[in-house]
């Protein structure tokens, strides 16, 4: 991740911004093969949502709510500025080719509800079913209706979260009407969010 990309985050991050992470190297190159994106679309491999943004002239600190194999996290990230150089010590950010932002305009009440949901998910892990549903190759090979029916059957309690569905659930708790009857790839989620703007 380069200094220019970090500068963009430094200047523009706000509460409710969804971050899309794009990995470089072998993993980044095989993701398009396994997912449903159209030819030429570059799919992110992970998404998270930003809350609790605090900034001054030399530093921006925020928390990112995300769900992964490690379970739910609501972790601290900092981006610092030294002269005209922007940097972070966050290991996950450093591994990325780039990070793109999709800001969502939120009221203070929506932000509060989103943060409450993010905190409630700390440490919550999903089991084997969630791993299978989250596997990217399933995104490509299961017909949408079959996938949706499977998801609804396994998710009767509306608790099933992987990185992209975690964002959908979080935004619903915050007061946005995003359908919870399907499992979304990170790119599908980003497209849904862009319709909220």
Could you tell me what each predicted segment is?
Residues 1-13, 23-30:
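Beta-lactamase-like hydrolase cores
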Residues 88-149:
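Active-site-adjacent helix/loop patches that line small-molecule binding or acyl-intermediate pockets
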Residues 129-197:
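Activation targets extended, charge/polar-rich intrinsically disordered C-terminal tails
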Residues 15-17:
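Loop/turn positions that initiate beta-strands
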Residues 41, 107-111, 156, 160, ...:
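Solvent-exposed, acidic/flexible segments
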Residues 21-106:
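Glycine-rich catalytic cores of cysteine/serine-nucleophile enzymes that process amide/ester linkages
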Residues 47-50, 54, 126-129, 170-172:
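A structural signal for the main folded, soluble domain(s) of proteins
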């Amino acid at each position: 991740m380069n200094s220019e990309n970090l500068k963009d985050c430094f200047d523009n991050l706000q509460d409710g911004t969804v971050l899309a992470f794009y990995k470089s190297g072998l993993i980044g190159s095989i993701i398009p093969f396994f997912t449903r994106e159209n030819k030429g679309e570059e799919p992110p491999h992970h998404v998270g949502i930003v809350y609790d943004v605090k900034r001054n002239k030399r530093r921006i600190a925020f928390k990112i709510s995300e769900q992964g194999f490690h379970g739910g996290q609501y972790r601290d990230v900092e981006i610092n500025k030294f002269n005209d150089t922007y940097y972070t010590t966050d290991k996950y950010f450093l591994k990325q080719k780039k990070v793109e932002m999709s800001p969502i305009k939120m009221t203070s009440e929506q932000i509060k509800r989103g943060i409450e949901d993010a905190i409630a998910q700390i440490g919550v892990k999903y089991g084997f079913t969630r791993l299978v549903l989250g596997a990217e190759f399933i995104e490509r090979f299961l017909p949408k209706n079959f996938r949706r029916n499977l998801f609804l059957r396994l998710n009767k309690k509306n608790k099933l979260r992987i990185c992209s569905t975690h964002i959908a659930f979080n935004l619903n708790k915050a007061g946005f009407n995003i359908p919870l009857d399907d499992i979304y790839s990170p790119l599908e989620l980003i497209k849904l969010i862009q319709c909220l703007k």
